[in-house]
UniProtKB/Swiss-Prot annotation:
Statement: the UniProt record of this protein carries the keyword Kinase: no
Record: residues binding Mg(2+): 25, 27, 85
InterPro entries tied to this protein: PLC-like_Pdiesterase_TIM-brl
A GO CC annotation given for this chain: extracellular region
Reactions this protein catalyses: an N-(acyl)-sphingosylphosphocholine = an N-(acyl)-sphingosyl-1,3-cyclic phosphate + choline; an N-(acyl)-sphingosylphosphoethanolamine = an N-(acyl)-sphingosyl-1,3-cyclic phosphate + ethanolamine; a 1-acyl-sn-glycero-3-phosphocholine = a 1-acyl-sn-glycero-2,3-cyclic phosphate + choline; a 1-acyl-sn-glycero-3-phosphoethanolamine = a 1-acyl-sn-glycero-2,3-cyclic phosphate + ethanolamine
Gene Ontology biological process terms from the UniProt entry: killing of cells of another organism; lipid catabolic process
Native organism: Loxosceles hirsuta
Co-factor binding comment: Binds 1 Mg(2+) ion per subunit.
EC number: 4.6.1.-
Active site as annotated: 5, 41 (nucleophile)
Predominant localisation class: secreted
Full protein name: Dermonecrotic toxin LhSicTox-alphaIA1iv
Length: 273
């Protein structure tokens, strides 16, 4: 999965997919009542990027729905996975469940079109704080209460705080999650980060009894780092330059080992060599 980083304006969806992304990451900010408000990152963000592009969250969802609904004039067949980077740092811990409920209602209405031929992309809820694990239950309970448990099949999870792998496992246990787990590891492109924890996550994924199904590394903008991440066995790479990742995947060393995921590839299934 080539994951376009910080895609917060509707116009950027096309831009990143056209460069080779089959997945995008979108920031979601919340208001003081735990309502998802904007797709907005703000300053500081990554080196070489405009941090200030934004939409109202529900407007972005409608644009995203158009881009991921077959038959729509804006449809992009390649776009199959969306990571919502949930900026829950502005919330109190006791608002996490509420944030999950409100997020679910927004997605149900504006993205999934209340289950009536809505967007088809798989969705990952990425949470920066392990203490905010109740967000997951708030979200999943709401889908069930609203009569759409089938949409849980489209839903995956990520804790993005680079916490110890064992602590992340405990948070999922509390949240009642087993499966559909992506594990992120990374740091802003302005700084360097080694691959120690990525390798640990990959080992957990491949152990047969770990909690991780997929591992992605962020934010990778250079060819050398892309090669290192692929050599470590990641499933996804988040990038500001999808064309760079595409180029490396076309190199002789990687062409036979990796391919770009399509809609038919289940993002919740651990890949067995």
């Amino acid at each position: 999965w080539i994951m376009g980083h910080m895609v917060n304006a509707i116009g950027q969806i096309d831009e990143f997919v056209n460069l080779g992304a089959n997945s995008i990451e979108t920031d979601v900010s919340f208001d003081s009542s735990a309502n998802p408000e904007y797709t907005y990152h703000g300053i500081p963000c990554e080196c070489g990027r405009n941090c200030k592009k934004w939409e109202n969250f529900n407007d972005f969802l409608k644009g995203l729905r158009s881009a991921t609904t077959p038959g729509n004039s804006k449809y992009k067949e390649k776009l199959v996975l969306v990571v919502f980077d949930l900026k829950t740092g502005s919330l109190y811990d006791n608002q996490a469940n509420d944030a999950g409920k409100k997020l679910a209602k927004n997605l149900l209405q504006h993205y999934w079109n209340n289950g009536n031929n809505g967007g088809r992309a798989y969705i990952v809820l990425s949470i920066p704080d392990l203490n905010h694990y109740p967000l997951i239950k708030g979200f999943t309970d709401t889908l069930k209460q609203e009569g759409h448990p089938e949409l849980l099949g489209k839903l995956g999870y990520d804790f993005s705080g680079n916490d110890a792998i064992g602590d992340v496992a405990k948070a999922y246990k509390k949240a009642g999650v087993s499966g559909h787990v992506w594990q992120s590891d990374g740091i802003t492109n302005c700084l360097l980060r080694g691959l120690t924890r990525v390798k640990e996550a990959v080992a957990n994924r491949d152990s047969g009894n770990g909690y991780i199904n997929k591992v992605y590394y962020w934010t990778v903008d250079k060819r050398a780092t892309t090669r290192d991440a692929l050599d470590a066995g990641v499933d996804g790479i988040m990038t500001n330059y999808p064309d760079v990742i595409t180029d490396v995947l076309n190199e002789a060393a990687y062409k036979s080992k990796f391919r770009v995921a399509t809609y038919e590839d289940n993002p919740w299934e651990t890949f067995k060599k």
